[in-house]
């Protein structure tokens, strides 16, 4: 057994324990895409509700899906779910007020 320890090239006094870097110095962990999409979803939801534009309501649903897909599991989901429900309600209300199919905005 002592021969095995003598042939081991590792030096136990040089072993350093791994410490993860703080999140403030790692810009890759601070992805602002979910926050931007959440804000855009709320803006488009309000435009869809107030201006009765169906395409704005659908863009809000799309932005909410992107925000949900890009978020981290450690984030609080209350704001994201409220944005998602606001966008769904914008679509529902715009089709309740005018049930005709959506006309393209161009």
From Swiss-Prot:
One of its GO terms (cellular component) is protein folding chaperone complex. The keyword Glycosyltransferase does not apply. The modification N-acetylserine is found at residue 2. Residues 2-32, 71-74 are cytoplasmic. It is a multi-pass membrane protein. GO terms for biological process: multi-pass transmembrane protein insertion into ER membrane; protein insertion into ER membrane. The keyword Endoplasmic reticulum applies. It holds the Pfam family ASTER. Keywords: Acetylation, Chaperone, Disease variant, Endoplasmic reticulum, Intellectual disability, Membrane, Transmembrane, Transmembrane helix. It is found in: Endoplasmic reticulum membrane. Residues 1-29 are annotated as: Disordered. InterPro entries: ASTER (IPR005351). One of its GO terms (molecular function) is protein folding chaperone. It comes from the Eukaryota. Residues 52, 96-106 are lumenal. The chain crosses the membrane at residues 33-51, 53-70, 75-95. Belongs to the Asterix family. Component of the multi-pass translocon (MPT) complex that mediates insertion of multi-pass membrane proteins into the lipid bilayer of membranes. The MPT complex takes over after the SEC61 complex: following membrane insertion of the first few transmembrane segments of proteins by the SEC61 complex, the MPT complex occludes the lateral gate of the SEC61 complex to promote insertion of subsequent transmembrane regions. It is linked to Neurodevelopmental disorder with variable familial hypercholanemia: An autosomal recessive disorder characterized by global developmental delay, motor and speech delay, impaired intellectual development, intractable itching, and signs of liver dysfunction including increased serum bile acids, hepatomegaly, elevated liver enzymes, and gallstones. Component of the PAT complex, composed of WDR83OS/Asterix and CCDC47. The PAT complex is part of the multi-pass translocon (MPT) complex, composed of three subcomplexes, the GEL complex (composed of RAB5IF/OPTI and TMCO1), the BOS complex (composed of NCLN/Nicalin, NOMO and TMEM147) and the PAT complex (composed of WDR83OS/Asterix and CCDC47). The MPT complex associates with the SEC61 complex. PANTHER family: CGI-140, PAT COMPLEX SUBUNIT ASTERIX. This is PAT complex subunit Asterix. The gene is WDR83OS.
